[in-house]
């Protein structure tokens, strides 16, 4: 049982285990510990033993860090669960839970006894005299068997998880807190004249999450492209082992022929731009009054030279690498190169 106000956030990724511990100091969130444990092989490599690699990483985490008496929050891929948003009719707030349960039966394609689910009224919802008028509700669910599967590595290692959250929603929460808090706290949401939206692209190892939000509303999509696709392109065209291709990708500018490396990866650059364009286009078809003003990109792959500029040039958007947090303190952690 956690006895402090500190929280560990843990992600079991395809390439590494990542963990960040934060605590509250008054109203300030302070990062006070961080760990990044890269696996000897990526979990998706054919010869890898994922369960063994993750178990070894968790043992290292426990040896190097104090996780007792802290809450543990685990992020899981967006495709592990379901997130849907709907606009309920005007209803008494005290009856909203019953309305949401009815909606859950319609929206969740499984028996509710087989899922873990919850809901949240989104910021900007209008509540007057005990009635929710103009509102939007987020509905979130995961199959119980999927929850058990995600928890299994930590259960086996004796790490007790207090909270599970799908990664795209965690990203939204970060944006809402770190960059849009003044808007959410001080502005009234107008569905006919919504505030500008931000796109955040989180590039993972085998897939990427794209989130579009104005702070009050959220739209998300998982894209079947990640950092490994660049590596595989090099493996295929340059006849390299996966390990050598990964090293070349990470050190492209120091290669014997950098131009050849980037030309080889260009098809994946183009595929990524196409996927982003398709996602933004679909979002705009559903939200005709939305105005997108910037694209933030995150993940280790964004360190690859030229990627951010290439995406921005082809999309016609201002692109920024998400390499800092406005409302997170703790220089001892924030200055660590592995964290950045």
Language-model segment annotations:
Residues 290-320, 324-326:
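Glycine-rich phosphate-binding loops at beta-strand->alpha-helix junctions
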Residues 1-38, 70-77, 133, 181-230, ...:
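Gly/Thr-rich phosphate-binding beta-strand-loop-beta motif of the actin/hexokinase/Hsp70
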Residues 42-46, 145-173, 179-181, 215-258:
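Glycine-rich phosphate-binding loop plus the immediately following alpha-helix
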Residues 58-71, 157, 240, 277-294:
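Phosphate/pyrophosphate-binding loops at sites that engage ATP/ADP/AMP, CoA/4′-phosphopantetheine
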Residues 1-107, 148-150, 156, 160, ...:
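Non-catalytic, solvent-exposed interaction/assembly segments
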Residues 71, 76-184, 294, 324-331:
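Active-site neighborhood for divalent-cation/phosphate handling
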Residues 224, 245-294, 301:
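Adenine-nucleotide phosphate-binding core of ATP-dependent small-molecule kinases
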Residues 170-173, 228, 302, 320-340:
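Glycine-rich phosphate-binding/hydrolytic loop that grips phosphoryl groups
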């Amino acid at each position: 049982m956690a006895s402090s106000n500190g929280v560990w956030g843990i992600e079991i990724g395809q390439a590494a285990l990542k963990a960040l511990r934060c605590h509250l100091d008054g109203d300030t969130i302070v990062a006070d510990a961080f760990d990044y444990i890269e696996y000897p092989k990526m979990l998706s490599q054919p010869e890898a033993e994922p369960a063994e690699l993750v178990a070894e990483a968790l043992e290292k985490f426990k040896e190097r860090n104090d996780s007792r008496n802290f809450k543990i929050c685990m992020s899981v891929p967006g495709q592990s669960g379901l997130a849907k948003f709907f606009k309920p009719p005007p209803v008494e707030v005290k009856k909203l839970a019953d309305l949401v349960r009815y909606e859950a039966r319609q929206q969740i394609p499984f028996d509710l006894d087989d899922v873990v689910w919850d809901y949240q009224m989104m910021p900007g919802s209008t509540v007057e005299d005990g009635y929710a008028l103009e509102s939007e509700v987020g509905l979130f669910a995961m199959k119980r068997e999927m929850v058990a599967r995600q928890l299994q590595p930590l259960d086996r290692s004796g790490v007790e998880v207090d909270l599970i959250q799908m990664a795209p929603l965690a990203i939204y929460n970060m944006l809402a807190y770190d960059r849009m808090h003044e808007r959410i706290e001080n502005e009234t949401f107008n569905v006919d004249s919504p505030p500008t939206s931000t796109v955040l692209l989180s590039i993972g190892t085998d897939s990427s999450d794209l989130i579009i939000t104005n702070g009050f509303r959220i739209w998300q999509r998982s894209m079947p492209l990640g950092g490994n696709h660049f590596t595989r392109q090099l493996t295929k065209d340059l006849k390299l082992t996966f390990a050598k291709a990964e090293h070349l990708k990470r050190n492209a500018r120091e290669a014997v022929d950098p131009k050849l490396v980037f030309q080889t990866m260009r098809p994946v650059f183009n595929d990524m731009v196409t996927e982003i364009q398709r996602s933004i286009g679909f979002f705009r078809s559903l939200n005709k009054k939305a105005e997108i003003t910037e694209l933030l990109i995150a993940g280790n792959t964004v360190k690859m030279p030229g990627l951010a500029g290439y995406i921005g040039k082809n999309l016609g958007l201002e692109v920024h690498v998400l390499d800092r947090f406005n409302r997170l303190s703790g220089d001892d952690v924030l200055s660590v190169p592995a964290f950045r």
